[in-house]
Amino acid sequence: MSERHSIRIGPAGWSYKDWEGIVYPPHRGRFDELAYLASFFDTIEINSPFYRIPPPTHSKSWVRRVAHNDAFKFTTKIFKGFTHEKAELKPGDVDAFRAYLDPLAEAGRLGALLLQFPWSFKDSPESRETLATLFGQFAGYPQALEVRHATFQNEGFVDFLNEHGVSWVNVDQPLFHESVKPAATVTGPVGYARLHGRNYEKWFAHSESWERYSYLYSKEELEPWVERIDEMAQAKETYVITNNHFRGQAIVNAVDLKRALGQEAKLPGTLGDNQANVSSQSDSPTPRRKNPK
């Protein structure tokens, strides 16, 4: 077996009100959530740029706040104007987003730029033209593409990503008709996986956005992902992001994966050293449906 490259595992985001007193210890006054989590994980996916392009002062601050962890690298979502809501895109947004990325890249703290597209985005010549344009706009940064429609899961599209030097994002999500299925595909500069949970009941029928991400994976459900991650890491530096963030469930599962892959890991805050504490925080048990291995 070839040598395993580095595997960084961590949550999507760090600023959630429902993490207070669970992921983060009870505190008064100022508390640096990012710095705290960077003592437990070597990566975190930055969510906030999806909603608004941050100024470079934000990325410079984030770099400073993880300085105590030499191994730490961020991944970051791209602004939704490039992928979801084109009407929100303004002249100068490419330059503004690159200016935000530069402090991360120059500090050696940028693992990947996540280009996340919705399920409604399907493979077609027009879609590939859209993607090629976007790849060119952010040339020079390590890019990873998340698509969720099954039409993209073909050898021709893998070749397309390899030609452009862009990573495929392997996804775990509820499997509906024409959903992308779990895989261990590696293209581009890094291996990348995102685990969103399997909350079938609330994935589309939710009143609050957090509801679809309220899901705690069992260790049995994570076992196939341990194998996939190990396979991905034979080829590339790999990032694994747990996005089932509600009430810290992403933290528990990130620690589960780290331990299963032989990495030292401990649970932060008041989570305790088992899944019972966080699962008891959920409003109700999530109905289980098996995803294919």
At which residue positions do the language-model features occur?
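Residues lining hydrophobic/aromatic ligand-binding pockets adjacent to catalytic sites
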Residues: M1-K293
